[in-house]
Amino acid sequence: LQRSVFIGWDPREAAAFAVARSSLKRHLTQPIPVRGLVLDDLISSGLYTRPTTRKVNGEGRFEMVDILSIREDYDGRVATQHANARFLVPHIAKEGWALFCDGDVMFRGNVARLFDSLNPKYAVYCVKHKHEPSAGMKMDGQQQTRYARKNWSSFLVFNAQHEANRALTLDLVNTLPGRDLHRLCWLEDGQIGELGIEWNWLAGCSKPVDDPKVVHFTLGTPDMAGYERSAYSDEWRAQLNNWAA
């Protein structure tokens, strides 16, 4: 099966994206296309039509608001521009295995081996976190939100040709509240394959493991105030310096 990787892009997290992309390529043992998932491109191509607006947060910064996701206890603010755009990946990839990951990850393992291990009977693979974040703020002053299957969607391997993913139409992606998309509502439980925790290890949240293949700085990357000493922060900074050299 064809293989591809899509990394979420947000202009406020350019350094994080650089680390994610360069660390992924550094560990690859075979050529796999890697591209950024850029909201402006998806809007201009007509793929992304979800209504959005902007609000100013408590730090005076603009934040994107997903209007379809607003409810009585949630104002619709999303942490990144790719919050809901990720669900377009099977449509863009069209065939084979397509990995999406948030931009605040660092790869320490070979994604080619991950692809080799997958079973095509599953529509999607992810790490099935039992992660209940505490209320409050996370990276860049973003509000921490809670929803079913929190962080499952931060690292998804889509089987683009799977029959079940035909239900993930452009209309569905562009009309459902984000919380429904993030809980993988178009799939039955048995259609979701499980990856080991090492493929989406949450810094500051997950229990220690010997050798995480992907470190996810979900609370904040090491260049953000308060997260400079996160686990694997020195490795992250070294990767950033290598990219910039």
Where does each model-flagged region fall?
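A glycosyltransferase accessory/donor-loop signature
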Residues: L1-R12, A18-V19, T29, G36-L68, ...
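Alpha-helix N-cap/loop-to-helix initiation residues
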Residues: E13-A14, F107
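A short acidic (Asp/Glu
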Residues: F17-A18, G46-L47, N110-A112, M137
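Short, acidic, metal-binding catalytic loop of nucleotide-sugar glycosyltransferases
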Residues: S23-P31
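Short, structured active-site "lid" loops
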Residues: T49-A93
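A short catalytic or substrate-binding loop motif that flags glycine-/basic-rich loops and adjacent residues
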Residues: Q81-A83, Y147-K150
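GT-A fold catalytic core of metal-dependent nucleotide-sugar glycosyltransferases
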Residues: N84-E132, V157
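Short beta-strand-to-loop element that shapes/binds the nucleotide-sugar donor at the catalytic cleft/hinge
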Residues: V124-Y147
